[in-house]
Amino acid sequence: MSRIGKMPIRLADQAQVEVKENMINVTGPKGALSQALVDEVIVSVADGAVTVQRKDDSKRARAMHGLYRMLVSNMVEGVTKGFTRKLEMSGVGYRAELKGNLLALTLGYSHMIYFQPPAEIKIEVPDPTTVLVSGIDKALVGQIAAKIRSFRKPEPYRGKGIKYEGEVIRRKEGKAAGK
């Protein structure tokens, strides 16, 4: 039995889970999410908890068991609390600003980079070197944060670029001067 898959998911008071055929719908105060289910797993709701079970013991069913348990868990957490990724910029002149819903980034290129997030993602800029990406879908929040980070990844010599909060950049030593 999957160690992760066998754990029940406790539902918060505000979250409601509905299972219909091969779809699971989770609704909460922050919004609603739905996920298609594969044939190898069975999702059931009882006593304020969601359980995920597998139909057989095939290798694929075992893999899907843990995966779908975490997907449902992330959906429940997303519609109740939400998810946030914090990006930090370091480098001379590197800054971000919000123009309406458009994120404008100055990253040392000859031009500014404009990024339009999807409607379900909220972007905040508390200060010019910090960007907060938040939403109810964990995968989408991570994907958008990775997209913003990809505009100027941290470089190993000076550490300039966009990095996640708490990310450790492996630094390299520059070329040694001649003898």
Swiss-Prot record:
Keywords: Ribonucleoprotein, Ribosomal protein, RNA-binding, rRNA-binding. The keyword rRNA-binding applies. GO terms for cellular component: cytosolic large ribosomal subunit. GO terms for biological process: cytoplasmic translation. GO terms for molecular function: rRNA binding; structural constituent of ribosome. Pfam families: Ribosomal_L6. Disulfide bonds: none annotated. Coiled coil: none annotated. SUPFAM superfamilies: Ribosomal protein L6. It comes from the Bacteria. Part of the 50S ribosomal subunit. This protein binds to the 23S rRNA, and is important in its secondary structure. It is located near the subunit interface in the base of the L7/L12 stalk, and near the tRNA binding site of the peptidyltransferase center. Belongs to the universal ribosomal protein uL6 family. This is Large ribosomal subunit protein uL6. It comes from Chlorobaculum tepidum (strain ATCC 49652 / DSM 12025 / NBRC 103806 / TLS). The lineage of its organism: Bacteria, Pseudomonadati, Chlorobiota, Chlorobiia, Chlorobiales. The gene is rplF.
